[in-house]
C-alpha cells in the first residue's frame, strides 16, 4: 500500500474496506497497511477469508496491531454479516460504527456526510472539494 494514501483508497472491495476500518480503530495506518497488504494478498474476498481463517489464526496474524482478540472477533462477525448485508446502513455490520459508516458513504456511495468527526476523513473531504 502507498504510504501517503488512506487505506480506504487502496482496497479492492467493500469487505476489504470494512476490515481496514476495524483494524484502523486506535491504530496508526502505518502499522495497519503491511498487515492488510498480506491479509488481502492471501484472501481478497470474504468468501476466501472464511475458508482460510478462524479466530485463533487471525488473532495470531494481526497480533502486531494490538487488541488482536477483539479485532479478530469483529472481523469474523463482520465478514459473516457482509455476506447478507443489503449495502445500505454500514452500522448494521458488526463492529462498524460512525467512522466506518462515514467512510463507506464517502468512498462507496459518493455521499459526503455533513457531520464527519474523524480528522483523516475531514482532511480527505477538504482535498476533494
How does the language model describe each region?
Residues 17-23, 75-128:
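Catalytic DNA-binding helix-loop module of base-excision-repair DNA glycosylases/AP lyases
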Residues 1-87:
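N-terminal polyanion-binding entry modules of DNA glycosylases/AP lyases
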